[in-house]
Amino acid sequence: MDLLRLREKGIFLSQRRRKWLIFMAISGVSGYGAYKVYHLPSVARKRKRLFKLFGAIVSVAELISDSAETLSMVSRDVKDFLNSDSDEIPNSLKQIAKITTSNEFTDSLSRVSQAVTIGAFRGYKSESSIGDSGIEKSSDSSVVDRVIDKVFSEAGTGFVSVVVGSFAKNLVLGFYSGKVESGVKCEGSDSSETPRWVTLLGDDKCRELLADCIERFTSTAIGVYLDKTMDINTYDQIFEGLTNPKHQDSVKDVLVSVCNGALETIVRTSHDVFTSSRSKNVIEEIEDDDFKSNGSARSKMVSESGDGVKSNGWTEAIATTLAVPSNRRFMFDVTGRVTLETTRSIIAFIMVKTFQGFRKSINVVHEEVTDRGRQAVEYVGAKSSVIITVCLALYLHIISGCVRNSPIGVSQHF
């Protein structure tokens, strides 16, 4: 009995040890496999990405918590400031303003906006250049050309006009409201403070920007104009329009109006200059003498001398002007040219009118002579036909009388 028990107990222990050995072997193999799989390159890359993802999630959580604390602090300061009557701005808002006005923040913001804009344009361009079938298609027009086409369409022009109008309106309202709030008058103010926009325009960078804009705009406009008018002669078109018979009356009216206005302006300006300058100088000198000498007789002389100056202002001014040799030469040249052109115009007009009169008289004489000759020919023809008719009738009457009274027959007479 004891042997049977010991045998059964040994068999049970051996089976139990065998299970443990099998379990340990399986555990070792699985652990080794897990170790190998864990240290594979692909698994290592995925593991690093997963760790980075977890790190990013943790950083975002920390950022959210920190920003929540910051927002709560800023909102609390703003709430306290709005509820209080103090004029001092909280320190949190001052620090935020310092951050927003710092060079690092503006540079970072400009770089981020630049990168976002470039990425958006590249993505839009790549998407537009690839068709639905995945084959790249050649785009004839660029993004800028398509944007300009959209802007210059009917809907685009309406949208742009609304946007520009609202922007200008809000800009003007904000400018004047800021002036009113700061206590600066818009016009006629006695304050010596220079407006902010004047200071901005007077800045070196703003002047460089304006100069670059004007240069670009001018060069572009001139280039486009030269390209468009390369094969066009502007002066030929102007003279063709002026010499067109359809525009003769309009051109005459325009030239007459321009010449009349120019002459009127020259005469009026020269008269005002010659009279006012000389009269003012003489009157000022005489008034100085009046103040020194004190008398009513002097004032009377002033009025008389003023009248004399006004009456003799033209002659004195012309004499003074002609005293200069260059002015005299110029005056003689202009006078000679005007006289020559006037004489030429008068002679041409007289010749044209004389030629027209000769033509009319010749035509009248020719018509009169032709009418009289035709009437004479008609009269002579009528009279000659009557005479011939009478002669023939008389001749036939005589012949018939002779034949009737003679005893010889008609055949014997002929």
Swiss-Prot record:
One of its GO terms (cellular component) is membrane. The chain crosses the membrane at residues 20-40, 379-399. Its main location: membrane. It is found in: Membrane. This is Protein PHLOEM PROTEIN 2-LIKE A10. It comes from Arabidopsis thaliana. GO terms for molecular function: carbohydrate binding. It is a multi-pass membrane protein. Keywords: Membrane, Transmembrane, Transmembrane helix. The keyword Transmembrane helix applies.
